[in-house]
Amino acid sequence: MHRADCIFCQIAQGHSPCHPIWEDERHLAFLSIFPNTKGFSVVITREHHGSYAFAADETVLAGLVLAAQKTAKVLDRAFDDVGRTGLILEGFGVDHLHAKLFPMHGTAGLASGQWQPINSGGRKYFEKYEGYISSYDCERASDVELAALAAHIRRFA
């Protein structure tokens, strides 16, 4: 299925331009036209699926993740200073299932197995989603609060 009002469907069908970097029969990866780092890419399903990854059929989601993995390896090889590529499945921007890939420039040493921690020093705690995802650690949470939150979440498992 394709939706005429979906820009990713238009791109997948070849009706809108993109700068492709990898593709197979079910997926297409292309450079973002709004990059916040060199090589920032988007991997989409060729068929239209809603953007919330965890509402997708397991086979569809697994296919997208494997396509993202293949694309990430291409990005890792394409940049001398990249040893890892980050993945986000936030589902905003376009209501079409997609993964965002971020080559992590400055991580080349990690590719050879020389793991090292990289800490941003960020300390902002988010009460609500602000349009972007941050992966830095914040202040240490109390074990009492964490235990209560874990108990609450387990009730829905």
Segments (PLM) and residue ranges:
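HIT superfamily nucleotide-processing domains
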Residues: 1-157
